Amino acid sequence: MAEKRGRVTIPTDLDVIRETLDIMKEWGADAIRDCDGTEFPQELKDTGSKIYATYYTTRKDNDWAKAHPEEIQQMYIMTSIHTAVEESLEIHLMDHLYPDMLAVNTRDDIRKWWEVMDRTTGQPVPCEKWSYHEETGNVRIQAVPFHQYTVSFLAYIMWDPVHMYNAVVNDWKDVEPQMTFDVRQPATREYSLKRLRRFLETHEYVDVVRFTTFFHQFTLIFDEMAREKYVDWYGYSASVSPYILEQFEKEAGYPFRPEYIIDQGYMNNTYRIPSKEFRDFQAFQRREVALLAKEMVDIVHEYGKEAMMFMGDHWIGMEPFMDEFAQIGLDAVVGSVGNGATLRLFSDIKHVKYTEGRFLPYFFPDTFHEGGDPVKEAKVNWVTARRAILRSPIQRIGYGGYLKLAIQFPDFVDYIKEVCQEFRTLYDNIQGVTPYCVKKVAVLNCWGKMRAWGNHMVHHGLYYKQNYSYFGIIEALSGSPFDVSFISFEDIKADPALLKNFDVVINVGDADTAQSGGEYWIDETVSTAVREFVYNGGGFIGVGEPGAHQWQGKFFQLDDILGVEEERGFNLNTDKYNWDEHRDHFILKDCDGEVDFGEGKKNIFALPDTEILIQKDKEVQMAVNTFGKGRGVYISGLPYSFENSRVLYRAVLWSASAEEELNCWYSTNYNVEVHAYVKNGKYCVVNNTYEPQDTTVFRGDGSSFDLHMEANEIKWYEIG
């Protein structure tokens, strides 16, 4: 069979023209792009390939930023907490912040846009009781001894955080920090639209404008040693300015307070249950960002080019699963692929013509150096993401960075050639078809579809000890044969019958976080809707501290469904006798030994009629319970692994009372998975490991056959 070409984007630069042509041929690439820190060679204009041009809406024009310092982008910063030991307290604003990145904004009215908080009382300090001294950079407070205080203030972003990150990682020398200007403000808005037109007129050879992005950077702050200090990939605190906030006040109908963003210092991160004011601000930002983004996209279309958005960096307000996004008219979205869940962040996007995954490793020296192993990183990245692609296909793949680094690793070049060929085959077999889904699953949390697939993410695709046991559920779902939706508590309050659309509901997270739900569980509309859903035959899987909030004599509000409760000292007087395990349960049939619960949970005990599957030292790790016609499953934590993915798969089937549906498009070996595309008349069997595997494969009609597979292998079959 002749090798195919296409659906692959590669980076280039001025010093790798011949090498770019070689790699294009080797990998079958049909698109070339520039990257941050590289330039597109004019010699490659006429290769016949699609040409992407990275376009920065908010930076790479320091002359404009310097001439209009009042329209440089800003962010809200809160100082650390300081304890007053006398009646006067001074707080230095820029402590532990990188001085070249931020500059305190004293241009606008600090009495209106700053806030000094008494963190002991939770109240703002009256303006007449504090003052700012520019010569020292300190705020002086008339304090109450032994109360604690913080200062929330606006700062200009003098060095774009992403440009700074790239400069630090790559050790760029003598590079002028790129300032971040605010495209939303009047003069810069007018200038930016003209600037875009100038770019299009001088880059007639460009086919795709790759916007990076529209228009506000996620929260990323560096400390005085240029180390990452604070990051929130969903953070809104760098999308502010007095100009924007005054517009918000007019729309919202109430005065803005810095605390609506600062949120006691938590900055409304993904784990915080969002306040009404913060939701209002997000909705306002989404509408305004979408309107301006549409203007830019329309201009690109006017010049006969495609508009692509990079999902990251300055992307706040562009949440792609919200209604505003559909009105923008983008042709494509490209996203960085860290794992299966990060791929689903953009592969599930509607209202675009195509999506593209930028795979790892990025061609930067942190991976491509003597002793580095880019092949290993590429294998892990591809095999992990492939599970998700098989459930929700993307249309293109690509790579970024310095091509001159990648070509120094011939084994890497050879492996990516295999990946490109495999992807094209995969695309041909599954594109345009919904894969077989055994059940409809809803993940319930405070964010719903707004943060679908990213609701346990702090920084893009990175591991955190405190959440990997929960994120494992999301990663497993990203490549499992379920029709997965993300719903919020507000969705249920608006329409309790919504739950009838699903077979199983999953709630995963720690108590009183946005993931678990906190006080939403004492809202009778929510709790009764979930109980009714399960009682009438639905399934409920709770992981960690699901439905947990101390109320009316219990912590687990759905203890009647899950059959477990958490001992917090209030039930020590009550003896517990149910500790027998039932490890022969349907859910555990494929487990070879001990189940990995990750960090697990302490002090979980079972109610008298609950069936415990696993307990350790009289702490329940997994249990099942029947409630009416429905079933509940409790799991203390479930990090991602192939075995745990199978545990979750069986838990979904059991909770939905669908054990008999197990042997349908199924592999007996949990390291191997089966995906069926009935409309296309095809199915595939995929080995997710780096070793050969043997399995028995069940087809959709229940018939089966034995199969030996090589490492990472994927086999395609016809149905029928």
Q: Which sequence ranges carry the predicted segments?
A:
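Catalytic domains of carbohydrate-active enzymes, especially glycoside hydrolases
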Residues: 9, 15-50, 195-212, 325, ...
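Extracellular ligand-binding/catalytic regions of CAZymes and related secreted enzymes
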Residues: 220-223, 404-437, 478, 557-572, ...
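The substrate-binding groove and active-site-proximal loops of carbohydrate-active enzymes
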Residues: 6-12, 29-35, 100, 170-190, ...
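A short, well-structured beta->alpha microelement
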Residues: 8-22, 35-39, 309-318, 474-498
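Noncatalytic N-terminal accessory/assembly modules of large enzymes
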Residues: 2-59, 63-100
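A glycine-rich, often tryptophan-bearing local segment used as a flexible ligand/cofactor-contacting loop or short
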Residues: 517-593, 598
